[in-house]
Swiss-Prot record:
Function of the protein: Cell wall formation.
Catalysed reaction, written as an equation: 2 D-alanine + ATP = D-alanyl-D-alanine + ADP + phosphate + H(+)
Principal location listed in the UniProt entry: cytoplasm
The protein, known as: D-alanine--D-alanine ligase
Domain ATP-grasp: 107-300
Pathway(s): Cell wall biogenesis; peptidoglycan biosynthesis
Domain of life: Bacteria
Cofactor note: Binds 2 magnesium or manganese ions per subunit.
Organism: Halorhodospira halophila (strain DSM 244 / SL1)
Needed co-factor(s): Mg(2+); Mn(2+)
Subcellular location: Cytoplasm
Record key words, sorted: ATP-binding, Cell shape, Cell wall biogenesis/degradation, Cytoplasm, Ligase, Magnesium, Manganese, Metal-binding, Nucleotide-binding, Peptidoglycan synthesis
Family: Belongs to the D-alanine--D-alanine ligase family.
Length: 304
């Protein structure tokens, strides 16, 4: 099948999972699902948890499937090490990973590229204040954290300090971003292909950690209800944003569609979740790609 490497030619595969970030538990779930899929496909794949094993031991593998989420796995650090070791790996390289992890710098890059993204600013100190160009309500979040950890919707200045405190517990760089009223969508990217978009629906104030991984009432609408032209427009925008931020191989771009029908880029995820609640497998299934094939094709992107 096109894009799927021959297990006999791949060699040993390390599934890098777990780690020490705040997203360790999600990483273990993603990595476990990926490992099982690779083994079902006939690959010589093993779990490798850098919390318990030195990364130097990766020298004994031929390719690494990165299933780490958050710092130390999604921010370019492990990618840099693997580059030095000369071992191919799944997903984006050092630059794309670092930019994808840093929501503020990614936003600035998109703004400089003329891509639509909500107004935002960094918050600092014990008395954070919004600039005039960023009005309430806002979403306050750690600039370098995933899975919507540490995020709060803020309706007015009296709530800002507490939201800053919550976000700062995860990262010393805190971003305030203008709230976009409308519907949230996400687009998964696999190689050169934008997979069918997903429209997200949740009774929560936004698509937070609980909505992503715990809630049973979160709606994942795929197909999303967009017409063919709208679907193509959204897919092209997300591919452009992904490429502009240095993304490669596979990933996901989250967007909002405001009440006027305009798209707004929120963030890039260079190592999306692969759990039973995750979005990329849902989009792939809509495109006729089963989970095992999806995992094998992601591996194949690393070996192109």
């Amino acid at each position: 099948m096109s894009g799927i490497p021959d297990p006999q030619r791949v060699g040993r595969v390390a599934v890098l999972m777990g780690g020490t970030s705040a997203e360790r538990d999600i990483s273990l779930r993603s990595g476990g699902a990926i490992l099982a899929a690779l083994q079902r496909c006939g690959y010589d794949a093993e779990a490798y948890d850098p919390r318990d094993r030195a990364l130097e031991g990766l020298r004994g593998y031929d390719v690494v499937f990165i299933a780490l989420h958050g710092r130390g796995g999604e921010d370019g650090t492990v990618q840099g090490l693997l580059d030095l070791l000369g071992i191919p790996y799944t997903g984006s390289g050092v630059l794309g990973s670092a930019l994808g992890m840093d929501k503020w710098r990614c936003k600035r890059l998109w703004q400089g590229s003329g891509l639509p993204t909500p107004a935002g600013q960094l918050l600092t100190g014990d008395r954070p204040v919004l600039d005039e160009g960023v009005g309430y309500p806002v979403i306050v979040k750690p600039a370098r954290e995933g899975s919507s950890l540490g995020m709060s919707r803020v309706e007015g200045p009296e709530e800002l300090a507490e939201a800053y405190r919550v976000a700062a517990a995860y990262d010393d760089t805190v971003l305030a971003e203008a709230w976009v009223e409308g519907e949230e969508y996400t687009v998964a990217l696999l190689g050169d292909q934008a997979l069918p978009s997903i429209r997200l629906e949740t009774p929560h104030a936004f698509f937070d950690y609980a909505a992503k991984y715990q809630a049973e009432d979160t709606g994942h609408h795929c197909p999303s209800g967009l017409g063919p032209e709208e679907e193509a427009e959204l897919g092209a925008l997300c591919r452009e944003a992904f490429i502009a931020s240095g993304g490669n191989g596979w990933g996901r771009v989250d967007v909002m569609r405001d009440t006027g029908g305009r798209w707004w880029l929120l963030e890039v995820n260079t190592i999306p979740g692969m759990t039973d609640h995750s979005l990329v497998p849902i989009a792939a299934a809509q495109a006729g790609i089963g989970f095992d094939e999806l995992v094998a094709r992601i591996l194949g992107e690393a070996l192109r």
